[in-house]
């Protein structure tokens, strides 16, 4: 593994352990040239999941891109980064190869965010659904509010 600090190709593994619920292996390495330490992750390469964009262009699924979108929507909100990371990195394993339209990725991300935080959900929805007016925001917020009103309420008696 090439050292990210000095680009030396020589390193040794100090520690290995399962990560992401066994979906990957986390390795601590030490460069034999500069002696700095770094972490790498190893995961099985399955058939790549291809994302079909609205324009029709296909590209390989990138969990980091999904994670960035979720993190941006959840910025300064009480949403655990670990939950976002788990969702983004397990997404490809759930779908398992083939093709998926960006609309489906967005829909699943919104389904994931909704119970976690309303503000993060609205932020993500505003980009995913391409809100073009204040009315669209209000409509979505009313939909959230209506969903809360339908939930059963506990009887204090």
UniProtKB/Swiss-Prot annotation:
A single Gene Ontology biological process assigned to it is: negative regulation of DNA-templated transcription
Gene Ontology molecular function: ATP binding; double-stranded DNA binding; zinc ion binding
Which residues form the unnamed zinc fingers? 3-34
Which keywords fit this entry according to its UniProt record? ATP-binding, DNA-binding, Metal-binding, Nucleotide-binding, Repressor, Transcription, Transcription regulation, Zinc, Zinc-finger
The annotated regions of Polar residues compositional bias extend over: 8-17
Q: Which cofactor does it need?
A: Zn(2+)
Region listing for Disordered, in residue ranges: 1-22
Is Zinc included in the keywords of this UniProt record? Answer: yes
Which residue windows are transmembrane per the record? none
**Start and end residues of each ATP-cone domain:** 49-136
Residue spans making up a coiled coil are none
User: Do you know which InterPro entries this protein is assigned to?
Assistant: ATP-cone_dom (IPR005144), NrdR-like_N (IPR055173), RNR_NrdR-like (IPR003796)
Note the Pfam families from the entry.
Answer: ATP-cone, Zn_ribbon_NrdR
Q: How is the cofactor bound?
A: Binds 1 zinc ion.
Give the protein family.
Belongs to the NrdR family.
Report the function annotation for this chain. Negatively regulates transcription of bacterial ribonucleotide reductase nrd genes and operons by binding to NrdR-boxes.
What is this protein's name? Transcriptional repressor NrdR
Organism expressing this protein natively: Deinococcus radiodurans (strain ATCC 13939 / DSM 20539 / JCM 16871 / CCUG 27074 / LMG 4051 / NBRC 15346 / NCIMB 9279 / VKM B-1422 / R1)
Name of the gene encoding the protein in the UniProt record: nrdR
């Amino acid at each position: 593994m090439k050292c990210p600090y000095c680009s030396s190709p020589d390193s040794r593994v100090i520690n290995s352990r399962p990560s992401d619920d066994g979906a990957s292996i986390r390795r601590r390495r030490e460069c034999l040239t500069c002696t700095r330490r770094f972490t790498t992750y190893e995961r099985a390469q399955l058939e790549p999941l291809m994302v079909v964009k609205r324009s029709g262009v296909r590209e390989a699924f990138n969990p980091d891109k999904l994670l960035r979108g979720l993190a941006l929507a959840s910025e300064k909100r009480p949403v655990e980064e670990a939950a976002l990371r788990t969702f983004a990195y397990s997404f490809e394993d759930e779908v398992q190869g083939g093709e998926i339209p960006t609309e489906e990725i967005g829909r699943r991300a919104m389904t994931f965010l909704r119970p976690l935080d309303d503000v993060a959900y609205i932020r993500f929805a505003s980009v995913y659904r391409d809100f073009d007016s204040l009315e669209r925001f209000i409509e979505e917020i009313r939909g959230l509010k209506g969903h809360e009103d339908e939930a059963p309420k506990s009887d204090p008696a």
